Swiss-Prot record:
Belongs to the herpesviridae tegument protein VP16 protein family. This is Tegument protein VP16 homolog. Transcriptional activator of immediate-early (IE) gene products (alpha genes). Acts as a key activator of lytic infection by initiating the lytic program through the assembly of the transcriptional regulatory VP16-induced complex composed of VP16 and two cellular factors, HCFC1 and POU2F1. VP16-induced complex represents a regulatory switch: when it is on, it promotes IE-gene expression and thus lytic infection, and when it is off, it limits IE-gene transcription favoring latent infection. GO terms for biological process: DNA-templated viral transcription; regulation of DNA-templated transcription. Its main location: virion.
Length: 410
């Protein structure tokens, strides 16, 4: 896609090699990622030393113990702190990520029917180790030598990231299933203990009834809590690995990226944790308007907090101004953790969408009877996201429109 916006090529004098190297220094926290020089070929993960495999969780343990075990298995001690940070941020960081619902559509541990959920622990599973550093089959593309190759390059980067994320997510789904089964066994044991010593005719039936009730009242909420931690780790780990390799690759070609014209058609693409272009030195537009320096500084503040490389825009950044600026927070606006939770709920609901259940309970006291939602995920997802929206407003579950990309000609 060629966009002929004039005969003058934007100046790249300020984006010479020395400033590019300084930009990397400013944005990069070496304590998080170790020795970058050892990864100069970009063929191995910057996180390859941190998490290779995760063991199966305890056969049976309380959700609180499982949560701490998951933190240790993922080597994700920063996870609870980051989730707390997401409670005080308003940006949508996650809804542009692919949901990959097909990975969950046959996962019976996510069934809305408690009997289905309980049946998943009727047989003993074999102990399994999970490779959490699985790589995608599509390699990170190299930047083009000429601006004419930029649109195709940006699409290839996006495709490569999507393949990488899906490959990793397949391993994470297996880990999620084993944690779900540990919760089920814990609730099963708790229900059995409550009937010990009781003078009742059918203690097993009583225990099963209590287990079904626990599944409805507690199980889905505990699964959602573990899933928030698990998928925050997935998204951050893959995005960090991919983005730092991408930044190192793109920062070596400032002249090419100075000819890029890039438009984020939706604001959530701009605030998203993943950006296919990190050295965006040409003309950049946000929802059809020129990107402001303050907006760039604000999203870079979040990126720095998350250990991600900053987005650099040579024509937007202001001389002698900081690269980051803390955004304001409003309790009346959606929160980042709400966007994450909504995104995860789409995964957890995939089984119910593919395998709809006959409604067992409806509200009979209303002329428009509706099915009662049995699954309790905890906090109201809708309340964490938005007030009643207008019909035209973009919702987190809506598929994002692709950004537009072109190049300037001399």
């Amino acid at each position: 896609m060629e966009c002929n916006l004039g005969t003058e090529h934007p100046s790249t004098d300020t984006w010479n090699r020395s400033k590019t190297e300084q930009a990397v220094v400013d944005a990069f926290d070496e304590s998080l990622f170790g020795d970058v020089a050892s990864d100069i070929g970009f063929e191995t993960s910057l996180y390859s030393h941190a998490v290779k495999t995760a063991p199966s969780p305890p056969w049976v343990a309380s959700p609180k113990i499982l949560y701490q075990q998951l933190i240790r298995d993922l080597d994700f001690s920063e996870g609870p702190r980051l989730l707390s940070c997401l409670e005080t941020w308003n940006e949508d960081l996650f809804s542009c990520f692919p949901i990959n619902e097909d990975l969950y559509s046959d996962m019976m541990v996510l069934s809305p029917d408690p009997d289905d959920v309980i049946s998943t622990v009727s047989t003993k599973d074999h102990v399994e180790m999970f490779n959490l550093t699985t790589r995608g089959s599509v390699r990170l593309p190299s930047p083009p030598k000429q601006p004419t190759g930029l649109p195709a390059y940006v699409q290839e980067v996006q495709d490569s990231f999507t393949v990488e994320l899906r490959a990793r997510e397949e391993a994470y789904t297996k880990l999620l299933v084993t944690y779900c089964k540990s919760i089920i066994r814990y609730l099963q044991g708790t229900a059995k203990r409550t009937t010990i010593g009781l003078n009742i005719q059918n203690p097993d039936q009583k225990a099963y009834t209590q287990l079904r009730q626990s599944i409805l009242l507690r199980y889905y909420r505990e699964v959602a809590s573990l899933a928030r931690l698990l998928y925050l780790h997935l998204y951050l780990t893959v995005t960090r690995e991919f983005s730092w390799r991408l930044y190192a690759s793109q920062s070596a070609h400032p002249d090419v990226f100075a000819a890029l014209k890039f438009t984020w058609t939706e604001r959530r693409q701009f605030t998203c944790a993943f950006h296919p272009v990190l050295c965006n030195h040409g003309i950049v537009l946000l929802e059809g308007k020129p990107l402001t320096a303050s907006a760039l500084r604000e999203i870079n503040y979040r990126r720095r907090e998350l250990g991600l490389p900053l987005v650099r825009c040579g024509l937007v950044e202001e001389n002698k101004s900081p690269l980051v600026q803390q955004p304001s927070f409003s309790v009346h606006l959606p929160r980042s953790v709400g966007f994450l939770t909504h995104h995860i709920k789409r995964k957890l609901d995939a089984y119910a969408v593919k395998h709809p259940q006959e409604p067992r309970h409806v509200r009979a006291d209303h002329p428009y009877a509706k099915v009662v939602e049995n699954r309790n995920y905890g906090s109201s997802i809708e309340a964490m996201i938005l007030a009643p929206p207008s019909p035209s407003e973009i919702l987190p579950g809506d598929p994002p429109r692709p950004p537009t990309c072109g190049f300037l000609t001399r």
